[in-house]
A protein has these predicted regions:
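Flavin-dependent oxidoreductase catalytic cores
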Residues: 1-326
């Protein structure tokens, strides 16, 4: 089998393998990014950050920009509706953080974002995509990338949008295989992703959406034509998937899934890092929402999930996970 797990370049930044952790709001903070990195992710992308939050020195926003040692290469994703504001925020990030890459969100489908003329709203207008990327790219020395969807209501502009981004100067493009209207329903549109992969001739293309197994990851490379796979929801509760994909790309061998005990060890490590980042009260509250992902597919999950949802301290969760000595 040909080794698919070779490094690739985003601008002047070398990504050591073909797996990327997608940005996910409320999930891909430094606590989870460091775990994903240790378990094989070649590049990790920060949860989306508001350009206005940076502009107004919002304390919560600035705290989100924290990058731990060992995360690099890492990317910070920005969202916003005004190209001048986005450019100022990108410049601030370049000068004040340890990021290697800046990414622009052109795919978020949630109403709160699109009502503010940001995220997936841009998918309606390739000219605006070009204008915004061209402006932001002009103030940066580090690579600029973009993450988008196949379209707003349909994928008719997918290739045109991608080519506009490429012409404007992005160093890589990631695309989720659903339209904004689909949200997260239905299936990723692999035919459209393939068309985009063929159209982009100067930059790497990252395929995103419905990559839950090593075989699906391989399909995105070999059949869709992507240069790398970007994994979001499937990595929640199973960041070991990055290691499985890397191993499969190198050897063709499928590593077995982790045992329940090993999954709980990762979950516990995730919680401890959240506590270091945000303090016990906030971390435990957030972990209650993350725990169901780690418990997916395990016997007795409902009972344990219910118990964790009532926990309010690290000690309680340690007891429930039976990892008191971890």
């Amino acid at each position: 089998m040909t080794n698919l797990n070779t490094p690739f370049m985003i601008g002047n930044v070398e990504i050591p393998n073909r797996t990327v952790l997608a940005p996910m709001a409320g999930v891909t903070n430094s606590a989870f990014r460091t775990i994903a990195k240790e378990l094989g992710a070649g590049l990790v992308v920060m949860e989306m950050v508001s350009d206005k939050g940076i502009q107004y020195n919002n304390e919560k926003t600035l705290h989100m920009l924290h990058i731990d040692e060992g995360e690099n290469p890492v990317s910070i994703q920005l969202f916003g509706s005004d190209e001048d504001s986005l450019a100022r925020a990108a410049e601030f990030i370049q000068e004040n953080t340890k990021t290697d890459i800046v990414d622009i969100n052109m795919g978020c489908p949630v109403n709160k974002i699109v009502k503010n003329e940001a995220g997936a709203m841009w998918l309606k207008d390739p000219d605006k995509i070009y204008s915004i990327i061209n402006k932001v790219q002009s103030v940066l020395d580090i690579p600029l990338t973009v993450k988008m969807r196949t379209g707003w209501a349909d994928p008719s502009l997918a290739v045109e949008n991608a080519l506009a981004a490429e012409a404007a100067g992005v160093s890589a493009l990631a695309m989720h295989g659903r339209t904004r209207e689909q949200m997260y329903t239905g299936h990723a549109d692999l035919e459209t992703l393939h068309k985009v992969a063929q159209a982009l001739t100067k930059i790497p293309f990252l395929a995103n959406g419905d990559i839950r197994t090593v075989q699906e990851a391989k399909q995105r490379i070999e059949e869709v034509g992507a240069d790398a796979v970007m994994i979001g929801r499937a990595a929640m509760g199973n960041p070991y998937l990055f290691n499985q994909i890397n191993h499969y790309f190198e050897t063709g061998e499928i590593l077995p899934d982790l045992t329940f005990e090993d999954k709980m060890k990762i979950a516990y490590e995730h919680l401890k890092r959240l506590i270091d980042l945000k303090g016990e009260n906030v971390a435990v509250r957030e972990f209650r929402g993350l725990a169901p992902h780690y418990l997916r597919g395990t016997s007795g999950a409902a009972k344990l999930r219910g118990a964790i949802s009532q926990a309010s301290t690290l000690a309680e969760i340690e007891s429930l996970l039976q990892l008191d000595k971890a």
